[in-house]
Amino acid sequence: MPMAMNSPKRVQFLTASLSFVLAAGFAVAASAQDAPDVGPHPPQPLKAMESHIGNITGHSKDAKSDYRRYCAGCHGDLGDGNGENAVWLDPRPRDFTMATFKCRSTLTGTLPTDEDLFNTIARGLTNSNMPIWNTFTKQQRADLVAYIKTFSPRWEKEKAGEPIKIPAEPAVTMESISHGKALFTKLECWKCHGPQGKGDGPSAATLTDSKDQPIRPYNFASGKDDSRFKCGSTNQDVYKIFITGVDGTPMPSFADVIHPNDAWDLVHFLRTLQVDRHSKENDILKAAHGVIPPYTEKQAIAPASHGENRAAGGGS
């Protein structure tokens, strides 16, 4: 015979069942509290940072909106280079958590200056998806520099490196171009960049960056009158690359390998590889099957004035 709904046995059965369910629930909850947290972590509050560019002070707290609107799509909310657009981009967006930057005025392995990051935002990066952000005000750029610095603890523990000293550019001569060509061979630049600087050297297909992503050497021969190198368009910008290297890539620093003036000779030679570009170097050297014509005194060109050098200086 079925038990009555209000019988003592029915009440005891329901009470025991409820007690078991509650006990199991408490056990699961306790176990979850004791278990290690292996799920995704929510973004942690960012430490306030500042940047200093001339007489402008940037504040990270003032860049949150701009970063999320203009930068997070590629660089990610956490600054790790894993924004929703990143999977479609080549090269991948910069991972700010590593605090490793390509365009710097400081020696390899050191943090860039605030001015370096400021200039990179304004200038963009050639042959990448990093655009020119010259529509931002200087204050917005300074604030973004401060915000970028919140993503890595390196900025709390280390100071930015000292900017390298760039000696005055010597006159462009056939001698300097010839010496630069010899250095290009001796330093084995051709292994990556190719004998004609087209980025097609024998090692080009094997190169990877610091995240093991394929990376292409720069094609110097593609230059036009409006061309820019990765970190700028002036001869001073190219000079810096030889001394600072390009961190996060196979491009090393030659600061301990060559004399400062040797770097200028390399710059002058590289300009001649841009055969479609009108330059003082190509006014001297009209490439003819890669043969350098004899040097004459009339081919010497005076270096830029001090004012021009100063105007071309600054960050990366």
Residue spans for each PLM region:
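Axial heme c-ligation environment in periplasmic c-type cytochrome domains
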Residues: 84, 103-112, 116-145, 243-267
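Bacterial N-terminal signal peptides that target proteins for export
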Residues: 4-18
